[in-house]
């Protein structure tokens, strides 16, 4: 739970937009301008990659860049790939990115297997991790709108002498009281090794998904750890046909210096 951002096209208005956009961008501080440029580049690259894969895949919409999980898993024989990039608003040298595939195999229809490759950079110092994950659905009652699962994951640092960085246990519950509304509740436990400083903390999260239109869903969440991280995220999810979802979200920490960030992400399911 506690581990989940189009270039301009030339046309008749290109010269007009270029003349005005230069002045608009210059109004932004350099750090914000660089963060915005990185997010736009990532959106373009991600959508390009997803579009190529979508051409050879039979996909359905799902997935996202949020922390709070739901109680659903992929249908047997289906997979998804999530990619996201997050940049801090006031610290251009602090950013995170992740690529996370997951599949449910027909031979084990109640288990979703996945892994995430993530890169975090803080003040110029970076760390890369790989996170194997498994999620077992233990309850699915469509007539009641209830789904319940158990998810476990491990965190292994690839560029440290001591690779094991911790593990997570999370129990996500989803209730769908109305056709357009889904409510998510998470409860779990986290073990962080942190270079010898071992910590054990309870984790929690709440979230909602409200589908405003066929192509648009609004999502919000609040999550945290006992004595640790506390934050919220919210934003729209754009459904591009049957193949791709794109997330645009803002987030803010509720502790310390109350850092703010912008995240862009894309999901493909096939």
Q: Which residues does each PLM region occupy?
A:
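Transmembrane beta-barrel domains of Gram-negative outer membranes and organellar outer membranes
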Residues: 59-270
């Amino acid at each position: 739970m506690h581990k989940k951002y189009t270039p301009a096209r030339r046309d008749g208005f290109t010269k007009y937009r270029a003349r005005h956009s230069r002045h608009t961008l210059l109004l932004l501080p350099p750090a914000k301008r660089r963060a915005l440029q990185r997010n736009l580049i990532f959106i373009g690259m991600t959508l390009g990659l997803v579009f190529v894969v979508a051409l050879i895949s039979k996909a359905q919409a799902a997935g996202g860049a949020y922390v709070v999980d739901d109680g659903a898993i992929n249908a047997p024989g289906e997979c998804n790939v999530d990619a996201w990039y997050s940049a801090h608003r006031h610290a251009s040298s602090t950013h995170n990115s992740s690529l996370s595939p997951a599949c449910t195999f027909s031979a084990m229809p109640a288990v979703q297997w996945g892994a995430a490759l993530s890169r975090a950079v803080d003040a110029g110092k970076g760390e890369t991790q790989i996170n194997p994950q498994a999620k077992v659905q233990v309850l699915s009652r469509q007539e009641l709108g209830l789904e319940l699962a158990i998810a476990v994951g491990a965190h292994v640092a690839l560029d440290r002498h001591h690779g094991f960085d911790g593990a997570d246990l999370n129990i996500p519950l989803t209730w769908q009281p109305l056709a357009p509304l889904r409510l998510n509740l998470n409860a779990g436990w986290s073990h962080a090794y942190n270079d010898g400083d071992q910590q054990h903390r309870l984790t929690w999260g709440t979230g909602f998904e409200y589908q405003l239109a066929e192509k648009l869903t609004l999502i919000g969440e609040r999550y945290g750890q006992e004595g640790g991280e506390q934050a919220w995220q919210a934003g729209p999810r754009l459904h591009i046909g049957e193949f791709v979802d794109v997330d645009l979200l803002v987030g803010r920490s509720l502790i310390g210096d109350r850092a703010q960030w912008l995240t862009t992400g894309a999901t493909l399911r096939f």
